[in-house]
């Protein structure tokens, strides 16, 4: 080995000397004609130096040139497709480092309860029950009691009133609690005397009756009764999720929990027929040493790069606890708002160790869910033990969420090389109840991005969709400001823990690629890497801070192929990071955009008194403005409306969109 290495070194040295003596040899190879060129752009490569460029050239699925305008000319041949970016901003294809791809898709097939008022959810359940056969299950996902006027957990009686003849199963946004009715409890054989399982709880009223909310492992006896989606429905759901991801410029996504059946029956066929183009990093779900997934780990080596670098199967998902919102996150000490309760560990220490050992000893990366400080501590103990017993080069073990830790455990994790996979919008959602749950002292080790980065670690960012909206620009905004997409609180929640804009972008690009062992092929725009990138309607690095949440993807390119193009034929109004929904199209006239009055005031939650003029009131601001009626629909000028309500209005021509800023 040493002798061969010496010969190779001598040959390389000779070649270096030759090139130095005859530098023209280094330039002898002519640049090849690119398949496509994108030029005249504002390109953030997110390389080590965070350098910028103006042009990209692509051959096949790879970048063959990244640089300036003069240099790209050599790559333009007679058949090269050239796109003038017109100065628009380009960033690497975004990497969603923690979500449930199938869960997002399947949530689009059931009742959408995402952060909606309780009465709206109950109306949706009632509507489903009226058209469903008696006994048919009614499902939904996304409710969040912390945003309701009454933040108490909901009851089974509320669902009984609107769906007495159908079992109802509504999953909380975080996926760690369900809200069910009496029919669902009856079918599952669950009564007030049913004992809580390890890692779950049947919540009770003060007099010991079933409340109607169930957490974590206690959900399984009920969810197991619900007829599953067919294979065709699962494939449809996955493609729906892909469509949504591409629309945001997300070209890669980690799926936080995949069964062997789902891998073989859904992912592989869709990749094989060419309809699935999303790059997926799949974590195999592991909950038992006797499961099909455990057997898969014993018999199948971890591998990546399947289907031309579109699928990796080299990591394992474990659940160690539940969620903070459901009070099922495992804590070292009692919850501050529930004496005598410390949450739920899914497994004993020995059970967790055996599961971690199985995955680790078979060469897999770990991507284990841990919210509470006790759950994180348990995982770190197990990681530390298996790493000591069987040292492996560069295992890149991850903890998913890495949400609440003691300061000592944060340092321990970083010293061990454990990668924190965090979701920045979790902080801005949980801020509504986090300090009530764990108090002011423990919050110092929670959602502590600045602390983690300053100690020398990177952070892998994502949304945990469908727990949160999959929009990455909400996450980037939260990372930089510590505010929700509503702009709250105005000064940011614990703003000392903010990331810089560069760090936040790295958390969605180069750092995300490193978390997948894919830093050599994606995450930055460099020659030789995959041509994955997104064109934005504004400059992420320099736009007003409050506009980050409103960024729109104009074009998404994966492996050189355009997989999404934004429709800019009609103007969009972006309110609190989301486009308002209009039943009638806005009207564009020279210098003005008119929006449907009723659709707009309903979308922003304002009151209106309308006639020949309309008076719109939002909070303590009112504006009176003329009404234009077209085909029976009343319209008002968008700028006059929102500036009259004390808001900033910014027009982005590239996306034909208007961003509505915060109150002045």
Model region roles, listed by residue range:
Residues 1-12:
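Bacterial N-terminal signal peptides that target proteins for export
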Residues 270-274, 300-311, 390-392, 413-415:
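Acidic (Asp/Glu)-rich catalytic clusters
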Residues 30-39, 44, 48-297, 314, ...:
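Divalent metal-binding segments
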Residues 76, 129-133, 163, 271, ...:
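Sec/Tat-exported extracytoplasmic proteins
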Residues 567-664:
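Primary recognition of N-terminal secretory signal peptides and signal-anchoring hydrophobic helices
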Residues 356-367, 371-397, 401-402, 407-411, ...:
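His/Asp/Glu-enriched, well-ordered alpha-helical/loop segment
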Residues 19-31:
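Sec-dependent signal peptide cleavage junction
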